[in-house]
Amino acid sequence: MNKTVALFGSTGLIGSEILKQLIHDDDYETINVITRKKVTVQSKKIKNYIIDFTNLDGYKKVIKKGDVVIASIGTTQSKVNFNKSEYRKVDYNILLNLAKACKSNDASSLSFVSSAGANAKNKNFYLKLKGEIENSIIQLDLKSCLIFRPSLLLGKRNEFRFGEMIAQKIMPLFSFLMKSDYKPIKAVDVAKSIVNECKKKNKGYKFYHFDDILKVV
């Protein structure tokens, strides 16, 4: 397997857990962490590349042939002042440019975090957008693309989200009533499953829901 992984999105709940897993995983020698500003996590494995996420050429410079690429990129409505156009620039445009660079530079695989319920025909803005980016990336016909669809993530964020904090306390109490795809899941388990699946020689497109994720932790 390739000893180099390129990680886009290393500070969020899942991204930070992915970085921890990669640092302690002997199968990877080099972690290219691509960010907007310098990372604070220290490791001999880490090489930090700061790029302009709005420029496609920036992605092409840091993604190399054969790289394993992982993306855990996203924003929130509050961060973009509830501007749907700005939200789309992050959750759709950035990820699509990243995927295009994977295609043109012949990356071995792309794994990214989507959402349970993602559907381009959904009336919900968030789920519709997630479905649209999934469809757009699938149309690129990458060598290998792993799409992870967790529901509510359990774990401690660096930032405070009141609504999510309440949901994290309440939803697990009723998870036995939910369909498995929509059950809350630990962010660390999602991260472990992504890192583990990246080591396999998967071909084409594969979706991972709640049960699928827990099977490969």
Give the label of every model feature segment:
Residues 3-25:
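N-terminal Rossmann NAD(P)H-binding glycine-rich loop of SDR-like oxidoreductase domains
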Residues 4, 67-68, 109:
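Structural motif
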Residues 24, 120-217:
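Oxidoreductase cofactor-interface core, primarily capturing Rossmann-like NAD(P)-dependent enzymes
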Residues 46-97, 101-104, 198:
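NAD(P)H-binding glycine-rich loop region in Rossmannoid oxidoreductase-like domains
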